[in-house]
UniProtKB/Swiss-Prot annotation:
Any one biological process term the GO annotation gives: ribosome biogenesis
Entry GO MF terms: GTPase activator activity
Similarity-based family: Belongs to the YihI family.
Protein name (database record): Der GTPase-activating protein YihI
Residue span of region Disordered: 1-101
UniProt keyword annotations, A-Z: GTPase activation, Ribosome biogenesis
Length: 183
């Protein structure tokens, strides 16, 4: 079988081509296109544009550049010392006032209440609580204030021997019997 190459001609069933128009006729149809936009360099040649259109001269005289016209300082601004009013110094608190302020701290009271209830504190809270208690203890030592409970406890522990403890136990039992007899 012989081979036949494909052609671009469609044959009888193909769409019909438009009749060919001569070059002279095409030039008349298109004509010169209308210009759109400004001419090149129009932004920089403002003087030429104003010379060509004198009626616009009075109406518009503005800078063709876009953006802010505000001047910008290129050097660092010099620092001027302000004669600010000095801060009013508050009188220093006495040790007693510091102690009262520490003891009335709501966060301290809240954390102490949490400890009494048996809750665990976070590490940050525990650390803060220890610092506050140390401050309070230092102020109390400085002022000569001491906890009465702490003073009694060491005195008892020194004098306590086995015999003393047994005597106290028996006297407690006797007091209990006396109390029960009354009621």
């Amino acid at each position: 079988m012989s081979r036949s190459k494909k052609t671009r001609k469609g044959g009888e069933n193909s769409p019909k081509q438009q009749p060919r128009v001569k070059k002279q006729d095409r030039a008349e149809v298109t004509g010169k296109r209308a210009e759109k936009g400004n001419k090149s360099g129009s932004r920089h040649n403002e003087a030429l544009i104003q010379a060509q259109a004198p009626q616009k001269k009075a109406a518009q005289k503005k800078d063709p550049r876009h953006g802010s016209k505000k001047p910008v300082a290129l050097a660092l601004p010099t620092t001027t010392e302000k004669s600010a009013t000095p801060k009013v110094k508050q009188p220093k608190l006495t040790d007693e006032q510091k102690l009262l302020k520490l003891e009335e701290d709501p966060r301290l009271n809240q954390l102490l209440d949490m400890l009494e209830e048996g809750r665990n504190l976070s590490d940050a809270d525990q650390k803060w609580l220890d610092q506050q208690l140390n401050k309070i203890e230092a102020l109390m030592i400085k002022l000569g204030i001491s906890d009465e409970l702490e003073d009694e406890a060491p005195a008892k522990s020194k004098a306590d021997s086995d015999d003393d403890l047994f005597d106290r136990f028996e006297s407690g039992a006797e007091l209990l019997k006396d109390y029960q007899d009354k009621f």
